[in-house]
Amino acid sequence: MNTPEDSTLGREVAYPSGYDPSLLFPIPRAAGRQAIGLTGDLPFIGRDRWHAYELSWLDAQGKPCVATATLHVPCDSPSLIESKSLKLYLNSLNATRFNSAEAVRTRIATDLSTRAGADVAVEFGLPPIDAVGEGESIDALDLSIDDYGPPNAAYLCAHAQPVVEEVLTSALLKSNCPVTGQPDWASVTLRYRGAPIDREGLLRYLVSFRDHAEFHEQCVERIFNDVLTQCAPQWLVVEARYTRRGGLDINPLRSSASVPTPLSIFRDLRQ
């Protein structure tokens, strides 16, 4: 079984000179889920949406082409794709000739689907930037914080008040790569219906990820599971939009199956 320590993270590697799908490094999701007590049926649906900013290949005549792309990896795939391996794989296309852009899209989708173990959707282009911002930020709350990890779900609670439906946001989520220790920065959005979630407790909880080492996808699943367990909303959506690194950013989303309408798809201003 592949582990994060087996990947190219934190290692000096030569950039590929030709197309090489074996560069893609899948990591089974099961281990990360076991760490947060998810061993049976998943309490969520969702996907990991990647934005690729540095995509290039050669056309049939050898002329370089450039593009951006959006990749959708379903969260029920057996494996996630490690980010550095995805960067190296996409770079392996740089000197490869394709007869059409559609051939490139199909090749990427096929290779990612094979490694993830489920159908991965690939489309050219990127979502628009969310210049307005959905929901209400909790970042201006005036409170003292001195707990930066590990994530502490005990901060989470809901008030015994009538049910609300609201969207809460924070730009203060930070976690760290479990292999290299590099910081991962994100804006996080929680949309839910249920008893009002205590906002101070939610902010303290999110800040308690600051020294925590875990992959992006696992952080979002931990947040979803902790909020669901501690606050018992009728339904819940959690999305984190991580900042770009190596020409890629990742946006994991986990949602209750009963959500009436999905979140709009946007990029964050920091991406």
From Swiss-Prot:
InterPro entries named among the record's database cross-references: GTP-CH-I_C/QueF (IPR043133), NADPH_dep_7-cyano-7-deazaG_red (IPR050084), QueF (IPR029500), QueF_N (IPR029139), QueF_type2 (IPR016428)
Instruction: Provide a Gene Ontology MF annotation, just one.
Output: preQ1 synthase activity
* Superkingdom of origin: Bacteria
Q: Under which pathway is this protein filed?
A: tRNA modification; tRNA-queuosine biosynthesis
Which GO terms are recorded in the biological process aspect for this UniProt protein?
Answer: queuosine biosynthetic process; tRNA modification
Q: What are the positions of the active site?
A: 177, 184
Show the GO cellular component annotation of the record: cytoplasm
| Family from the record | Belongs to the GTP cyclohydrolase I family. QueF type 2 subfamily.
Q: What is this protein called?
A: NADPH-dependent 7-cyano-7-deazaguanine reductase
Taxonomic lineage = Bacteria, Pseudomonadati, Pseudomonadota, Gammaproteobacteria, Lysobacterales
Designated gene of the protein: queF
